[in-house]
Amino acid sequence: MGKLVVQGGAVLEGEVEISGSKNAALPIMAAAILCDEEVILKNVPRLQDVFVMIDILRSIGFRVEFEENELKIKRENDISQEVPYELVRKMRASFNVLGPIAVRTGRAKVALPGGCSIGVRPVDFHLEGLKKMGFSIKVEHGFVEACFERRIDYVTITLPFPSVGATEHLMTTAALLKGARVVIENAAMEPEIVDLQNFINRMGGHIEGAGTSRIVIEGVEKMQGVEYSIIPDRIEAGTYLVAIAASRGKGLVKNVNPDHLTNFFEKLEETGAKLKVLGNEVEIEMRERPKAVDVTTNPYPGFPTDLQPQMMAYLSTASGVSVITENVFKTRFLHVDELKRMGADIEVSGNVAIVKGVEKLSGAPVEGTDLRATAALLIAGIIADGVTEISNVEHIFRGYEDVIDKFSELGAKIEYVEKEN
């Protein structure tokens, strides 16, 4: 495990190409379990989480080839009903193979998930939904076992909260429940869910409504092989846009779907940044101190929780006081203490952070606590005076492809240093 050494004071200029969406690729890879024929996925980012999912697919009987950004998946052996704990503990999204394995083989046993430490993200919504679809659920010794027990004709599942993971898990599983009609109410509406619907439908599934709060799945008997391209990563795009603005630079962010970031764009413009949308590219310029703004995270189409830490780093040097309210992951403020070590003036009360803008941050040793928090500290290091050393930095490689090269090409001075034994 190494650290990132960031020399502050760089002004980011130039172009950056956005990779495929990790949060779309992972559930689509899990959905490939539904199909015996070869699935070819394009625009797949080369990230640690993707490699973990590849290992999971291989462990349960699939052949997986990954060259550049193209992934080929095909069932090679009988599907194993159990996923090793050492794989599932590495990544929360790996839990979403439980339903697809169970619907294919009648039974699945998967360890309770791991992943980023940003508060409780219970799997109860997943399990209650699977029960309604005819699966028995047993939780013991850190594992969840799902067994298919009864066929259903029709069921409505109302999620207590529009959970992205639960929505993806349940719609994927329901897609292969032949003859069943499953309705998910209060479904998450993220673009990644629309991408998953489009992928499953290309394989022969019958799903409607993704992108709205009501998704209807008509289960089919069999899926077919398909070639499919993953959507661009809206969170990666937002991270580079806010980094360029924070450095008071100018840049062009390419391979973006602007419709996926409308709320975020509005907030950037409120701070004084100038944005110009050019098809699937976004130009941003910011030459002055940002104005303070209030930010409230909400499920899509609200302001993305995955961009809240980066926005906080940006607003830490704004003129005035910003109020950031976190409504998705209530404890997603682990980065606050690290930003304060760099001179930020931030106070937290419950799920609200009060950010009083300071003139400058100063470089300091800090620690990455999760994926997006580490991205926020990288942005803070770029705009700070002096040198910032970010330890526990491996988080960032879970969500940003070629992150050091991309930031360096924009003019950031970043070096990855291996930790000495």
Curated annotation (Swiss-Prot):
List positions binding UDP-N-acetyl-alpha-D-glucosamine. 92, 306, 328
* Pathway in which the depicted protein is active: Cell wall biogenesis; peptidoglycan biosynthesis
Q: List the disulfide bonds.
A: none
**What are the subcellular locations of this protein?**
Cytoplasm
- State the InterPro entries in the record: Enolpyruvate_Tfrase_dom (IPR001986), Enolpyruvate_Tfrase_sf (IPR036968), MurA_subfamily (IPR050068), RNA3'P_cycl/enolpyr_Trfase_a/b (IPR013792), UDP_GlcNAc_COvinyl_MurA (IPR005750)
What is the superkingdom listed in this entry's lineage?
A: Bacteria
Q: Could you tell me the keywords of this UniProt record? A: Cell cycle, Cell division, Cell shape, Cell wall biogenesis/degradation, Cytoplasm, Peptidoglycan synthesis, Pyruvate, Transferase
Q: Does the keyword Transmembrane helix apply?
A: no
Reply yes or no: does the keyword Transferase apply.
yes
Chemical reaction(s) catalysed: phosphoenolpyruvate + UDP-N-acetyl-alpha-D-glucosamine = UDP-N-acetyl-3-O-(1-carboxyvinyl)-alpha-D-glucosamine + phosphate
Molecular function GO labels:
UDP-N-acetylglucosamine 1-carboxyvinyltransferase activity
Q: Which GO terms describe its biological process?
A: cell division; cell wall organization; peptidoglycan biosynthetic process; regulation of cell shape; UDP-N-acetylgalactosamine biosynthetic process
Residue numbers bearing the 2-(S-cysteinyl)pyruvic acid O-phosphothioketal modification: 116
Cellular component terms per the entry's GO annotation: cytoplasm
Q: Which Enzyme Commission numbers does its entry carry?
A: 2.5.1.7
- Where does this protein chiefly localize? cytoplasm
Q: Which residues bind phosphoenolpyruvate?
A: 22-23
Q: Which residues form the active site?
A: 116 (proton donor)
What's the family?
Belongs to the EPSP synthase family. MurA subfamily.
What job does the chain carry out? Cell wall formation. Adds enolpyruvyl to UDP-N-acetylglucosamine.
Listed HAMAP family: MurA
Tell me what this protein is called: UDP-N-acetylglucosamine 1-carboxyvinyltransferase
